[in-house]
């Protein structure tokens, strides 16, 4: 394995207690980045969740854990990997408390699963989930391809880890099997592969896990040896008669003393370390497995040696452990600004420097963890401080009395079954969707704090209008496919589809009435008006072969695509419980511009888009997208272009050959490069808007930034 980012540590500066003889110890050249990541995580937790008490994580003097166990972590990843590892240790401490363990585990698992499958999470404003969203956003920003598999691996770890803290294990074998999972087999795989940018082939992962079992167990034994005294004290403080530690298990299983159990543990750890050295030499010589699998297996040598060195000097397990001067300085004055966000710790809190102050004594020991001095409140305090402001004069808004269930019409016969009316809508709703708008609503609620019941109504209104607009768009554009399936009108016919789509406006209005105020109705009618005006211009240009200017095109987008974004943003502002009032118009307009232009671009270059909607569908529909406007302006006298476009209008569609001809002209004219460059500018506009909103609200929105990273092209 090649070493770029670490140096060999002088054996005279550490002690392994004979637990890993023959092992080299390496340390990362940029360990201060781990300092920043770990302390940033602690500050996030204190600000978003609550006090950490006497928590001591992965930092130490002279060595941090991560810089020892993954010495070849890519430098640009060390800070966020340190953040994630620190959160895992906090998670471990919380799940040790039986009262909260399962609920905490379930919440973490649900959030990681949601991020891995949809790229978002509900309730992103909640403390713990804000931290997870920050991790995901940063990892996706750095390496999107490896971030998602890593998050999936973490979900598996959380699902298993910490769920048997009260189990009285009856044998060493039973305990070992549990700990192989709990020590973080899946978590460590995800962390290490992301940190070192490894791509272990899927068919080799189980092999790697099996080969590394020896290393897993050795690390578990060393951990239990080093943490035994701490865990004894914790168990006594919590009134537990069970200690989840190999020493306790050996004492009970074999009826031996504490010292005898420790000695047996030491001897087994020594043997396993020697065995793993031989395993690595064997696999390094194999050429029938991938290079990254071999690197993964070899990297565990440093996990073993680093874990051994750190475990016996760290403040987490040793009362004599201390922190470095650099760490103490950061604890006192706060971590540097997050380069990705411009905030001190990623969470603006209204203080002068955004830091959490921790008192330390002269020898480098933390002496006080009281964080109230910086004005930060726990979740409970925040909730009690928020006053729910309700709109006055609600009686001025009443659409009608819907309390009575309609059983019949004018007393003659039963009411007609609405299933036929709803069938087209239910069809399109059932098609696969990324749920971007629902994700955006959850993200914006980090700022607005709309009560859950009203937030669900706003989501419902948004979903109804969005799907209804898709049904009408497909009819008006003559689309064949929607999300890879036949468009709704190709299943139910034009009349049924149009009727069902129009009815959804009634349903949306019924949902709106549940909000119970006049301002919401005003927002609803204004933005619905804008949406239809925008769509009318799009249809007019297509039908009459009128090529708009780029300015006119973006005006149309702000009405049509931006209208729905503005609708839910304005509704959330109306029902916000946050006393800070901020106008989202610039943000939603910029988001609409970027989203539509991205869609225009994907229509031309994305294989997935072709699968979902067809090859260059915009050409077939005759749409004047941003790329088409650029092409028309660049080649105004090109007769091939003009005739192909006219023939599309005459025939009502375009052949594959005609579409390929237009695409070739776009490549010749530099249209694709122009569109890609435009996306970069539009994305910067959205990022600037997000930063301005974060400044006005005083809270960084990790969930919104994660969505933006996932939408980023190129």
From Swiss-Prot:
Residues spanned by motif DDXXD motif 1: 92-96
One term of GO molecular function: metal ion binding
Sorted alphabetically, the keyword list is: Isoprene biosynthesis, Lyase, Magnesium, Metal-binding, Multifunctional enzyme, Repeat, Transferase
Q: Does the keyword Nucleotide-binding apply?
A: no
Residues bound to Mg(2+) 4: 473, 477
GO BP annotations of the record are:
alcohol biosynthetic process; mycotoxin biosynthetic process; terpenoid biosynthetic process
Biased-composition ranges for Low complexity? 341-356
- Segments carrying the region annotation (Disordered) are 332-356
Annotated positions binding Mg(2+) 2? 92, 96
One Pfam family linked to the record? Terpene_syn_C_2
Question: Which residues of the sequence carry a binding annotation for Mg(2+) 3?
Answer: 473, 477
List the catalysed reactions: 4 isopentenyl diphosphate + dimethylallyl diphosphate = (2E,6E,10E,14E)-geranylfarnesyl diphosphate + 4 diphosphate; (2E,6E,10E,14E)-geranylfarnesyl diphosphate = stellata-2,6,19-triene + diphosphate
Q: Where is this motif: NSE motif?
A: 276-284
Task: Quote the InterPro entries the UniProt record gives.
Answer: Isoprenoid_synthase_dom_sf, Polyprenyl_synt, Polyprenyl_synt_CS
- The residues that hold Mg(2+) 1 are 92, 96
* Pathway(s) where this gene product acts: Secondary metabolite biosynthesis; terpenoid biosynthesis
Q: What is its EC number?
A: 2.5.1.-, 4.2.3.178
Region feature Geranylgeranyl diphosphate synthase, mapped onto this chain: 326-713
Q: Where is this region: stellata-2,6,19-trien synthase?
A: 1-325
- The short sequence motif called DDXXD motif 2 sits at 473-477
* Chain residues that bind dimethylallyl diphosphate: 482, 560-561, 596, 603, 613, 623
Magnesium: is it a keyword of this entry? yes
Question: Which residues of the sequence carry a binding annotation for isopentenyl diphosphate?
Answer: 434, 437, 466, 483
Q: What is known of its domains?
A: The characteristic DDXXD motif for binding a trinuclear Mg(2+) cluster is conserved in both the N-terminal terpene cyclase and C-terminal prenyl transferase domains. The Mg(2+)-binding NSE motif in the terpene cyclase domain is not completely conserved, since the asparagine residue in the is substituted with histidine.
User: Which family, according to the similarity comment?
Assistant: In the N-terminal section; belongs to the terpene synthase family. In the C-terminal section; belongs to the FPP/GGPP synthase family.
Which protein is depicted? Answer: Stellatatriene synthase
- Report the gene name: Stl-SS
